[in-house]
UniProtKB/Swiss-Prot annotation:
This is Pyridoxal 5'-phosphate synthase subunit PdxS. Catalyzes the formation of pyridoxal 5'-phosphate from ribose 5-phosphate (RBP), glyceraldehyde 3-phosphate (G3P) and ammonia. The ammonia is provided by the PdxT subunit. Can also use ribulose 5-phosphate and dihydroxyacetone phosphate as substrates, resulting from enzyme-catalyzed isomerization of RBP and G3P, respectively. GO terms for biological process: amino acid metabolic process; pyridoxal phosphate biosynthetic process; pyridoxine biosynthetic process. PROSITE patterns: PDXS_SNZ_1, PDXS_SNZ_2. The active site is at residue 69. The gene is pdxS. D-ribose 5-phosphate binds at residues 12, 141, 202, 223-224. It comes from Fusobacterium nucleatum subsp. nucleatum (strain ATCC 25586 / DSM 15643 / BCRC 10681 / CIP 101130 / JCM 8532 / KCTC 2640 / LMG 13131 / VPI 4355). InterPro entries: Aldolase_TIM (IPR013785), PdxS/SNZ (IPR001852), PdxS/SNZ_N (IPR033755), RibuloseP-bd_barrel (IPR011060). Its EC number is 4.3.3.6.
Length: 280
């Protein structure tokens, strides 16, 4: 299991200047994008992989690992990112899907992949395809953490259900989830996914980030919540501290002070496009 990012924050950035802010704030990695999820959602239309030139500029600006997104099922975009030396590929529902049925066969790549999931079945199917990290889908670009909470609770609930099964019941569960038996057996024996399980989608405050850690996330992705806020530098540092000290309300309270205005956000009831429904 690749645990190098565990206990850390991965931040969306659109420029090398933002990447430097993220690195200085203590981010364990950055996600290079042309537009953060809030702007992708606002613009509508078809969203695709970012310009490789932009990604390479961000890669050259920081020493921490750089990730980038590809459309679901678009293995050529993934090949491009691998060719330029990206550290991690996110097969992401935030971009417009290229294939409504198939995901990328991640086992064909030497570069590791992270994928989104709303439940245990989605998580294990992505892992069976070769994903090395799972994140909750949440609802990116909203600043509303409710879906990330829902997805994390669902995954943890289903993990606990599998833990309670008898050995002979695991085969039925594997069939129901449409995943290999050995993955279900791992969850049963270890009480967790066989890869890191991060949270993403709607995290906007230090308290949000700490909440996701308390619910069982190994780490946190933060997208629009930092660079759509009033004081990105201070908020980025505060979220990193909250993730490190997620069990300490006093520290979280201190770092939450005077952060400037948080991103305005979109209530889940106002959302027209549900990105989390892409790619099951």
């Amino acid at each position: 299991m690749d645990t190098r990012f565990n206990g850390g924050v991965i931040m969306d950035v659109t420029t090398k200047e933002q990447a430097i802010i993220a690195e200085e704030a203590g981010a364990v990695a950055v996600m290079a994008l042309e537009r953060i999820p809030a702007d992708i959602r606002a613009a509508g239309g078809v969203s695709r992989m970012s310009d490789p030139k932009l990604i390479k500029e961000i890669m050259s600006a920081v020493k921490i690992p750089v990730m980038a997104k590809v459309r679901i099922g678009h293995f050529v975009e993934a090949e491009i990112l691998q060719a330029i030396g990206i550290d991690f590929i996110d097969e992401s529902e935030v971009l417009s899907p290229a294939d409504s049925v198939h995901h990328v066969n991640k086992r064909d790549f030497s570069t590791p992949f992270v994928c989104g999931a709303r439940n245990l079945g989605e998580a294990l199917r992505r892992i069976s395809e070769g994903a090395k990290m799972i994140r909750t889908k949440g609802e990116a670009g909203t600043g509303d953490v409710v879906q990330a909470v829902s997805h994390m609770r669902q995954i943890i609930k289903e993990i606990n259900l599998v833990k309670a099964l008898r050995e002979d019941e695991l085969y039925v569960m594997a069939k129901d989830l449409q995943v290999p038996y050995d993955l279900v057996k791992y969850v049963h024996d270890n009480g967790r996914l066989p890869v890191p399980n991060f949270s993403a989608g709607g995290v906007a405050t230090p308290a949000d980030a700490a909440l996701m850690r308390r619910l069982g996330a190994d780490g946190v992705f933060v997208g629009s919540g930092i660079f759509k806020s009033g004081d990105p530098k201070k908020r980025a540092k505060a979220i990193v501290e909250a993730v490190k000290n997620y069990n300490n309300p006093e520290i979280i309270a201190k770092v939450s002070e005077d952060l400037g205005e948080a991103m305005v956000g979109i209530n889940e009831n106002e959302i027209k496009i549900i990105m989390a429904e892409r790619g099951v």
